[in-house]
Amino acid sequence: MGAKESRIGFLSYEEALRRVTDVELKRLKDAFKRTCGLSYYMGQHCFIREVLGDGVPPKVAEVIYCSFGGTSKGLHFNNLIVGLVLLTRGKDEEKAKYIFSLFSSESGNYVIREEMERMLHVVDGKVPDTLRKCFSEGEKVNYEKFRNWLFLNKDAFTFSRWLLSGGVYVTLTDDSDTPTFYQTLAGVTHLEESDIIDLEKRYWLLKAQSRTGRFDLETFGPLVSPPIRPSLSEGLFNAFDENRDNHIDFKEISCGLSACCRGPLAERQKFCFKVFDVDRDGVLSRVELRDMVVALLEVWKDNRTDDIPELHMDLSDIVEGILNAHDTTKMGHLTLEDYQIWSVKNVLANEFLNLLFQVCHIVLGLRPATPEEEGQIIRGWLERESRYGLQAGHNWFIISMQWWQQWKEYVKYDANPVVIEPSSVLNGGKYSFGTAAHPMEQVEDRIGSSLSYVNTTEEKFSDNISTASEASETAGSGFLYSATPGADVCFARQHNTSDNNNQCLLGANGNILLHLNPQKPGAIDNQPLVTQEPVKATSLTLEGGRLKRTPQLIHGRDYEMVPEPVWRALYHWYGANLALPRPVIKNSKTDIPELELFPRYLLFLRQQPATRTQQSNIWVNMGNVPSPNAPLKRVLAYTGCFSRMQTIKEIHEYLSQRLRIKEEDMRLWLYNSENYLTLLDDEDHKLEYLKIQDEQHLVIEVRNKDMSWPEEMSFIANSSKIDRHKVPTEKGATGLSNLGNTCFMNSSIQCVSNTQPLTQYFISGRHLYELNRTNPIGMKGHMAKCYGDLVQELWSGTQKNVAPLKLRWTIAKYAPRFNGFQQQDSQELLAFLLDGLHEDLNRVHEKPYVELKDSDGRPDWEVAAEAWDNHLRRNRSIVVDLFHGQLRSQVKCKTCGHISVRFDPFNFLSLPLPMDSYMHLEITVIKLDGTTPVRYGLRLNMDEKYTGLKKQLSDLCGLNSEQILLAEVHGSNIKNFPQDNQKVRLSVSGFLCAFEIPVPVSPISASSPTQTDFSSSPSTNEMFTLTTNGDLPRPIFIPNGMPNTVVPCGTEKNFTNGMVNGHMPSLPDSPFTGYIIAVHRKMMRTELYFLSSQKNRPSLFGMPLIVPCTVHTRKKDLYDAVWIQVSRLASPLPPQEASNHAQDCDDSMGYQYPFTLRVVQKDGNSCAWCPWYRFCRGCKIDCGEDRAFIGNAYIAVDWDPTALHLRYQTSQERVVDEHESVEQSRRAQAEPINLDSCLRAFTSEEELGENEMYYCSKCKTHCLATKKLDLWRLPPILIIHLKRFQFVNGRWIKSQKIVKFPRESFDPSAFLVPRDPALCQHKPLTPQGDELSEPRILAREVKKVDAQSSAGEEDVLLSKSPSSLSANIISSPKGSPSSSRKSGTSCPSSKNSSPNSSPRTLGRSKGRLRLPQIGSKNKLSSSKENLDASKENGAGQICELADALSRGHVLGGSQPELVTPQDHEVALANGFLYEHEACGNGYSNGQLGNHSEEDSTDDQREDTRIKPIYNLYAISCHSGILGGGHYVTYAKNPNCKWYCYNDSSCKELHPDEIDTDSAYILFYEQQGIDYAQFLPKTDGKKMADTSSMDEDFESDYKKYCVLQ
């Protein structure tokens, strides 16, 4: 088997050549060249596929390949020819020698028995019994003994049966020549075969414009209108659409064009009659006649200037005149015969025929029969265009006058119109074509010197365009200013159709039309009109070339111009070496349309990728700041011509599409010099306005992979050039440069920057008075200083974008996890940023020790006040005042019912989104009755099995589960049958379908099967199997115990092809019960082949079928069953339409079935009964009354070629009806959730699992428990984090769930813990001194809160303070108030409080309320660090009862009010919102003071309820995948306008344009807050010295630069 040389040495190459003809040799050489290219060797895989075919078993094919001399290098052509000649034309003696060589030893002198048996096992799977006779005298034999034995035992094994027994089943040449599709179609129309071949190319190009894949009215209308009026477009479409399926197939368009342009006059009139017969009832009613007259008059006005009487008559008079003269039935309508008599001499009808004649040739692609017809068609079109003049937005094409004159002589363009009867419809009598002035004279004066010809359809240039490639070419979206949207633009450099100009052709009427000189012109040559390009760069546009300016080109002398449809027709008929499209634009000064001959010729530069220097390991962790030593090189990459009237946006979109670059990843710069570039970011400016002239350089900038912009990075690296960015802009509308996947940072910074009270704090410089450079857990003030500097730049109003180098450097220094070029989580960066700002600005320089006490049954107000006081004793800053709130965490022991309550600070709410626990699946059900398949939509559990899928589908489609067969269809065949116990997979190789299969029914007599009885039961237990050679079936009996109602159509035992060779394994029983599978198949013919078996290769198409089949099924029943299912795809014409407008000779449906059934293997390529060496494509199943014993084979539905091309509706294959469940399922899957549902889920109760058991202080052991989170107090600035990234089932996934959230008047008060009013009878407390660390609490009144329940949610970020966690929870992520929030759907629960039990406070005076806080960058967790810290927190001074109870739902609710030494001042450090009044009584050492009598009566006062109403002011959005994607920010400026911050780009946009679907972090601001109250007074305070901080940064940056 491993022979390295050919085993056919006994047959020379020269001898083999003598046995093949020259034609055969040329075909074999061409086939070899097509298959192997320029190589002289054919690989093994190619040999098996192209020469032998897929039907040959792989082991056998490998043996043949090696015996021919094939090696790892390949098989030489000479050896291939020798082998093919031996197999097909070799003598028996030569074949015997060949077989001997297969089994012989290396020396080739003898065959060893052991080696032969080994090879037979590989090839055949067994050793024949007769082999022992061959080796009866020894273990090896020579050729003579082997030959004698072989000729006596020709059926011994596969090779002998193939080559010596029964003749050769494959030949070198296949002489059979079945009629081609074109020949068949030519026989049923008046078109020649060449016309049909030419027309097919045009048809597929037109059909490719369809949005649905069908040549429907939506596609047809824009192609023909104009010049066809829209009122006639539908009628014209219906005239082509014979079978009324809203699709014009190629047969229909061929017959229609034949009837309209080439048929007898009566047939043409019949075609027009169909156009006007709207209701298709065979007559023209009075209404239809009126519409016809209106349309015909419009056609006349569009195409002629002649005056006719009908133009001055009343419509009713015209209609009545026609009826009076031609209504032979006197029933008020015209029959077809009446219409034909009227239209023969009517000029209106003749003019409509002329128009249809033009459209059919120019638009639909029919080639004119004579040059004279061609000239009249083009002339008529141009005359009509000349009356309209130039229309802005249309494209015209320039043609060299030299070629145009030659063409005009060829078609006799200037001669008098030629009347060709009756083959030409251009016979308008005296109203035929007049001798008007040249059609272009009226538009000649409007030719300008500029315009745009940018085409969004990519032009395909090729030196030689084959008919196959042209026919399959699909056009894009048409010209940018296309007159016929969707039409193709087929420009090629060379496509010359050379016909003999001196030949005789028969016209449609049999008259001889003699084509005499002048000669037919060649391809259109426009080269003399253009200049040679001095720049050698790829042109991105399709202008074809720059026209010469010197000498000046003159219209009519140097060039002619034609509209786009005429150009396409001429190009289709002649070809061209150069297309010169020029669009029509309106002059900006005169507003008159003109042709722009000389558009702007632009030169486009691209950045040359710079090699990145390996950074030092020391400094790479200090932020990815660009190196200043990497100059950016820009090189000329492309050229392009654009209209001076085009906008930057249009050019940007075109370049993006042409270069296949996302629009958001590309920018354009105006290049003035190496050091002076201008960003073209105003998309509405036109080139003319920007004064961009010819040969202007533009830079195409493309984002780096790390999302940074090369030009920006270059500017940053050379900081002296950044000054050019300093241009006036709106304050705050400044972008941030991407420094390498830093959009996550930019997005968070922009959100925080648009937090107005915080920004005013930094802009006013107050942060410099509060820098805490000694905080051990801070950043020595660097974070606050760098952020403050950046904010001042962002709000200076002098720069369009800045580079956050210092802040990026600082973040990377203190948090290396944010370093590198990887995408990060913007929420994590936001948490780090807020925490860093808080610690750097913390007014508490010496943090006291605090102890966290257990709630131990104490009232919530007391525990909350204690926790909040502890928090404030260690954390006070502008960040605490604005962003911090308080959460209530309750854990309840399920053993003893003990409740432990904790109150923890937060700086944003992290709400997990409910992960999709359902999958959306759409499945198509195909029934046996042939009805249109129906698509159903299902919503299944993520772990659902196919059993559940079938059950749900059964409820929808009405079939029993036993009748549903699920199959994965791929490549028009069934690839897999999912098992019921398998889990449903969304990702399959093909698409999932459900087939109806027959089910057992009560027995029916086998003697009376009907066409619809697919489940008839057998009356006998007989079934058939095949003999060992696969030739004849023989009956066997079913063993006892098998069901006798429905018997499998398989064999009990099947040795496929008589052998078990690994290619066709034996199957014990049919895998199908009561049915078989059928596949659609057609034969694809090729003229270049090696063996006859490969000339016609099978190709599967369409959807496979399930065909009922039992042992009682007749062969005719199989045909009936198949026809029932496919008849909708190939329906014959209705009887009344059998005689169509083209003389229809199609007999493809004349016989009973348009297909033949054959028995095939599963792959559908080869026969299931015949051995492989017969190269059988499938044994035919005759349509008779015999029983059909198919076995376990498949059935191929071999379509008759004529029926396939003329009747089969390919577009109907994928047509399905959508069940209402599809829309319902899609809606349910994509249905958004609202923010309230997320909050309800967040505040719902959940059970802690066994791995997160709670240590109960009562039980003194770990117990199961439930946990619940609630909101206690809310901050002025509420940040809501939608947790799209979650860790589920061991992997991180992103939720694409859409969350709907309010932009204005968001009220979260319903989710605050309701207070008990009975506990609100108290007096406010006063601090013991004037120090800020001793808070004073004022009573506040609060509104009633409706108690609402919620379901589980997820993490909440808390403070870095030691009060982070309950000490009772086991160290587990789920043990925290945050991570124990599950991400499932919410489960409603109820609270005990009623609306009437909401708290009120009795404070007498207006108090300034402390805002909730979280000062930590760490999430709530049960880590050991937090657990230990929580034990250290003692109970501090207890805050006032009123504030603790009543203000939780109000801004800063439940917060102790801190009073500065300056009474009545607004203290930013304390986060007060309202001015306070000092209260008389206080507390000492945490003990409550006495309540005043005055305060005790406050409960009688009217409630002053203040709701925490919020407005949205910023959104951070994430688009794309997990671990990548992109962040952008939408924020509201103080000018009340919304802006989109996309890294360095900042653009104003309408609020409706905000992409809320991808929202990730929401920023809300409470209504009515006074920013000034957050600004601390700096009188008497000293500003921190930050010079050393600046020096540190400069020093570190210089070290970095040196290392670069």
From Swiss-Prot:
Active site: 743, 1526
GO molecular function terms attached to this record: calcium ion binding; cysteine-type deubiquitinase activity
Keyword set includes Methyltransferase: no
Phosphoserine sites (modified residues): 1350, 1372, 1376, 1454, 1588
Enzyme Commission number: 3.4.19.12
Biological process according to GO: positive regulation of TORC1 signaling; protein deubiquitination; proteolysis
InterPro entries documented for this protein: DUSP-like_sf (IPR035927), EF-hand-dom_pair (IPR011992), EF_Hand_1_Ca_BS (IPR018247), EF_hand_dom (IPR002048), Papain-like_cys_pep_sf (IPR038765), Pept_C19_DUSP (IPR006615), Peptidase_C19_UCH (IPR001394), Ub_carboxyl-term_hydrolase (IPR050185)
Sequence similarity: Belongs to the peptidase C19 family.
Designated name of the protein: Ubiquitin carboxyl-terminal hydrolase 32
Taxonomic classification: Eukaryota, Metazoa, Chordata, Craniata, Vertebrata
